C-alpha cells in the first residue's frame, strides 16, 4: 500500500518518527511530503507545542527521553523553534527522497546543527549535494513546489507534523505509529461500530478562542 508522510524539519517528533519507518509492514511504499508546519498552524488557527511554555518544556524533555529509549542519536539545535524555511527549500530542491530527508533530519536533530546560520545552511546544502545553495533557495520552482506540497497536506486534513496519510485516514504524531501499523495490517478493524460512533460524536460545548499574552 502507498502511504504519505507529512513532515517539517522543525519537528523533533518527525525526526523520531522517521527512525521508526523500518518497522512498517513489508510492501508499504512511503512518499515523503514537505509540509510547512507554520502554514498548517495558521490555517487551523492553532498554536504550536513550543508556543505554550509548560508544553514546550515537556516536549523537549520527552523527545530527549524518547530518543534515549529508541537508541538514536539526538541533540536539540541551539534554538527552537527556529525558522527552517530555507532548510525545507533545500530538501524540496533535491526531491525529498527518504535518503535526503533522513540526511537533513540527522543534521538538525542528530547533530543539533543551527540551520538558521547561513554558513551551516550552506554546509547542509553541500551534504545534500546542492552545488549552488543560493540558486536553490531562490528558485521559483522550488518555492512553488514547497507551497504546493504544503497545500496538498492541508487539503488532506493534516493539522500537525508528522502525519501519516493512509487512504482517508490520518495518523498524527510519531506516537501514532503503532496505530498506523495496525491499520495497514487490518483496515477493517478501523471501521467497526466503536470507530464509527466516535466519528459522528456530537459536540457538547464550544468555547471562544482566547489570545493569551
Give residue ranges: language-model regions.
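Structural alpha/beta surface segment adjacent to cysteine/selenocysteine redox centers
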Residues: 13-111, 194-213
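C-terminal cap of thioredoxin/glutaredoxin-like
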Residues: 2, 10-28, 105-213
Amino acid at each position: 500500500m502507498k502511504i504519505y508522510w507529512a513532515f517539517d524539519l522543525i519537528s523533533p517528533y518527525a525526526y523520531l518518527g522517521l527512525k521508526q519507518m523500518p518497522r512498517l509492514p513489508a510492501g508499504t511504499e512511503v512518499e515523503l511530503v514537505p509540509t510547512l508546519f507554520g502554514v498548517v498552524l495558521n490555517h487551523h488557527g492553532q498554536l504550536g507545542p513550543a508556543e505554550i511554555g509548560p508544553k514546550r518544556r515537556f516536549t523537549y524533555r520527552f523527545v530527549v527521553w524518547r530518543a534515549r529509549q529508541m537508541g538514536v542519536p539526538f541533540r536539540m539545535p541551539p534554538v527552537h523553534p527556529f525558522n527552517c524555511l530555507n532548510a525545507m527549500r533545500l530538501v524540496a530542491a533535491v526531491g525529498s527522497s527518504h535518503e535526503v530527508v533522513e540526511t537533513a533530519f540527522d543534521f538538525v536533530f542528530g547533530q543539533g546543527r543551527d540551520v538558521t546560520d547561513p554558513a551551516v545552511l550552506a554546509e547542509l546544502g553541500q551534504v545534500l549535494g546542492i552545488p549552488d545553495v543560493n540558486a536553490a533557495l531562490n528558485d521559483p520552482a522550488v518555492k512553488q513546489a514547497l507551497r504546493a506540497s504544503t497545500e496538498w497536506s492541508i487539503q488532506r486534513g493534516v493539522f500537525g507534523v508528522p502525519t501519516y496519510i493512509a487512504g482517508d485516514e490520518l495518523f498524527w504524531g510519531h506516537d501514532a505509529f503503532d496505530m498506523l501499523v495496525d491499520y495497514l495490517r487490518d483496515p477493517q478493524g478501523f471501521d467497526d461500530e466503536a470507530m464509527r460512533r466516535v466519528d459522528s460524536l456530537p459536540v457538547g460545548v464550544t468555547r471562544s478562542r482566547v489570545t493569551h499574552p
